[in-house]
UniProtKB/Swiss-Prot annotation:
Pathway(s): Lipid metabolism; phospholipid metabolism
Function per UniProt: Catalyzes the transfer of an acyl group from acyl-phosphate (acyl-PO(4)) to glycerol-3-phosphate (G3P) to form lysophosphatidic acid (LPA). This enzyme utilizes acyl-phosphate as fatty acyl donor, but not acyl-CoA or acyl-ACP.
Main localization category: membrane
Name of the gene encoding the protein in the UniProt record: plsY
Cell compartments where the protein resides: Cell membrane
Family to which the UniProt record says this protein belongs: Belongs to the PlsY family.
Keywords on record: Cell membrane, Lipid biosynthesis, Lipid metabolism, Membrane, Phospholipid biosynthesis, Phospholipid metabolism, Transferase, Transmembrane, Transmembrane helix
This protein's record includes keyword NAD: no
Originating species: Finegoldia magna (strain ATCC 29328 / DSM 20472 / WAL 2508) (Peptostreptococcus magnus)
Protein name (Swiss-Prot/TrEMBL): Glycerol-3-phosphate acyltransferase
Source organism, top-level taxon: Bacteria
Key word Lipid metabolism present: yes
Membrane topology: Multi-pass membrane protein
Protein's GO biological process: phospholipid biosynthetic process
Length: 198
């Protein structure tokens, strides 16, 4: 196995992760920076709140497909290890994009793309959990947080079967939980914004 090529591919995937749907659309279409509006997060939920359903959906799809693409590239050349390295670096590139002064999104849509490629059925179950929570509570962040916790638990169980796939569940779940720490604090204190409300 040529680890040098894996490192190079991982770096490429980091820069693919730098492509932010919300920042690109807000700058190209609205001549604004979404990080100055709403929750100031460069993600699909904030894009939905600030610019509406179409932009929110477009943002989600861009961020989702870059994760899917990087997972595919990693798997094609390096199997499960490639998914771990390339998928993880893509998500890190989304969260900490050097092209945008290291101020990106929280990585949910991109992580979803990575994990959906790795294990479609299991991730669809996580998606159903997310949707149920959001529809019942109107809190997107709560759905994301519970999805991340579920991913970590699943990863801890699955790591015995496939170390690399189990590990990426754990790492992406922990990273996303860390990025949601302010949301968690607001949820605890009843100050988090519900979907459809600013």
């Amino acid at each position: 196995m040529n680890y040098l090529y894996l490192i190079i591919l991982g770096i490429v995937c980091y820069f693919i992760g730098n492509i932010s749907g919300s920042i690109a659309i807000s700058k190209l279409v609205y001549k604004q920076d979404i990080r100055n509006y709403g929750s100031k997060n460069a993600g699909a939920t904030n894009a939905l709140r600030v610019y509406g359903v179409k932009v929110g959906l477009a943002t989600f799809l861009i961020d989702f497909f870059k994760g899917l693409l990087c997972a595919y590239l990693g798997f094609k050349f390096y199997g499960s290890l490639g998914i771990l390295v390339c998928g993880l670096l893509c998500v890190i590139g989304h969260i900490l994009p050097v092209l945008y002064n290291f101020k990106g999104g929280k990585g949910i849509a991109t992580s979803f793309g990575v994990l959906l490629f790795a294990q479609p059925l299991q991730v669809l179950i996580l998606l159903i959990l997310f949707l149920i929570v959001v529809l019942m509570t109107k809190y997107v962040s709560l759905g994301s947080v519970l999805g991340c916790i579920s991913a970590v638990i699943y990863g801890l169980i699955y790591i015995r079967k496939d170390f690399y796939i189990g590990l990426i569940y754990i790492l992406l779940g922990i990273i996303s939980l860390f990025k949601h720490r302010s949301n968690i604090n607001r949820l605890i204190h009843g100050k988090e914004s519900k979907l459809g409300k600013n």
